[in-house]
């Protein structure tokens, strides 16, 4: 089995920075219906406290010959605004509430919020 980490990077979300908690949690529920809750995690892509030069560096590799703005534009190449319900790591509390409200029980919610990743990596042998 594998894992799918649901990204919270605004450019990856329905309605980008305006994505609602309910919409995000509904996406997770649909994925659980397809592949099972044990294969789902959160891949926050959270990058706080860094200047915009960091995202510019990430989008332009050492050998890039032209400027790449990724999902951004020349006019707005900075980090996108996070959804209001996940501006930093404290947003995991909002995710917990949202997942419970959408119908996940406590064990499933804890699995999605970290236990599944832990168990996945624990199972990898060198």
What are these regions (language model features)?
Residues 1-40:
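Catalytic pocket-lining loop regions of alpha/beta-barrel enzymes
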Residues 2, 29-36, 51, 100, ...:
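Hydrophobic alpha-helix feature that most strongly marks membrane-spanning transmembrane helices
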Residues 4, 45, 109:
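Conserved, mostly hydrophobic/aromatic
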Residues 8, 35-81, 85:
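Short acidic/histidine-rich active-site segments
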Residues 11-15, 48-51, 118-120:
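Flexible loop/turn segments at secondary-structure boundaries
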Residues 20-33, 57-70, 96, 125-126:
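Short, electropositive alpha-helical surface patch
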Residues 77-126:
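Mid-to-C-terminal alpha-helical segments outside catalytic/metal-binding sites
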